[in-house]
């Protein structure tokens, strides 16, 4: 097995997606089309080859400073990256997340990534909480406060939508000031990623109360897991606690799927997610000057 760095234009899209979809971790975050959107087509990758077959892939979104200094970063609306492919095969060949990190080309002077933990820990990384509701959970397993809020939402109706721009507008009005996102540098890329994807890989919906929209959300559909990637209430929705309804709705609509709430380093958000009695997983936050680390 040989690992090479490829620029985006050198990557075989079909071979890439086949590697991700048939691998141990079939997450939409790593699909070629999704990366193209959220990275604005500026990314490369480490690819492990078995002959001509892609056996493992490690996407590397990058930006440039002052026109020539390259650095790897974590895109918005893309919680975890890392190595994707057949983990058993990669492990047998002696590969891990840590070994892939050592192969990142030296021209990337800084690497800041959030990594999934399923191909080994990384020395020097920090473990971050990630909250996942197990498949089959319903509102009867939520805590008392969550169930109380859901009673106030009994008249709310949820309808699927293809208008991603409208969902993002609600999200921006709810959280944009805190996140400091901009349309040109953040939202347009995410919207484009969903346009490029087949609709089976995401679920977007609006929440209505008396035919008034009170919130909207987008979940990515990754095999048996949904990722809560984007959601926000209107002012009325905030008063009603409609985000509780988002979680209940997808738990009931997708009973065979885990619901990945994606954790939060903000204590109030983490406490909110704990209302739904999720299991706590973790991901790895890796921040290093690559030249020093090597």
Task: Describe the function of each predicted region.
Residues 2-51, 60-67, 116-237, 275:
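A conserved beta-strand-loop-helix scaffold within acyl/acetyltransferase catalytic domains
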Residues 41-43, 106-110, 202, 256:
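Short, high-confidence coil segments that cap the C-terminus of an alpha-helix
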Residues 50, 54-57, 78, 95-98, ...:
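Aromatic (often tryptophan-rich) hydrophobic motifs at membrane interfaces
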Residues 56, 61-66, 70-82:
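N-terminal cap/recognition module
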Residues 74-116:
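A gly/proline- and charged-residue-enriched helix-loop-helix capping module
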Residues 76-91, 176-180, 232-239:
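Short histidine-centered catalytic/ligand-binding loop motif
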Residues 79-81, 129, 154-155, 257:
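Short amphipathic alpha-helical segments
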């Amino acid at each position: 097995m040989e690992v090479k760095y490829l620029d985006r234009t050198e990557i075989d899209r079909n071979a890439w997606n086949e590697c991700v979809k048939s691998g141990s971790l079939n997450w939409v975050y790593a699909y070629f089309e999704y990366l193209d959107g959220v990275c604005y087509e500026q990314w490369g990758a480490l690819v492990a080859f078995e002959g001509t077959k892609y056996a493992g892939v490690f996407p590397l979104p990058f930006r440039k400073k002052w026109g020539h200094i390259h650095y790897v970063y974590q895109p918005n609306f893309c919680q975890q990256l890392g190595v994707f492919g057949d983990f058993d095969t990669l492990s047998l060949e002696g590969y891990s997340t840590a070994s892939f990190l050592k192969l990142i080309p030296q021209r990337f002077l800084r690497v800041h990534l959030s990594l999934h933990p399923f191909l080994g820990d990384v020395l020097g990384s920090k473990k971050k909480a990630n909250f996942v509701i197990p498949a089959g959970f319903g509102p009867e397993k939520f805590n008392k406060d969550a169930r109380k809020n859901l009673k106030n939402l009994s008249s709310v109706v949820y309808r699927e939508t293809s208008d991603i721009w409208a969902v993002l507008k609600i999200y921006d009005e709810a959280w944009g000031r805190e996140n400091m996102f901009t349309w040109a540098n953040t939202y347009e890329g995410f919207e484009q990623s969903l346009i490029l994807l087949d609709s089976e890989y995401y679920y977007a919906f609006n929440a209505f109360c008396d035919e008034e929209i009170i919130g909207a959300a987008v979940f990515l559909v990754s095999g048996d897991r949904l990722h809560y990637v984007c959601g926000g209430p209107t002012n009325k929705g905030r008063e009603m606690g409609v985000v509780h309804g988002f979680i209940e709705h997808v738990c009931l609509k997708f009973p065979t799927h885990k619901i990945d709430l994606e954790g939060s380093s903000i204590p109030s958000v983490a406490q909110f997610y704990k209302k739904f009695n999720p299991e706590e997983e973790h991901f790895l936050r890796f921040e290093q000057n690559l030249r020093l680390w090597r």
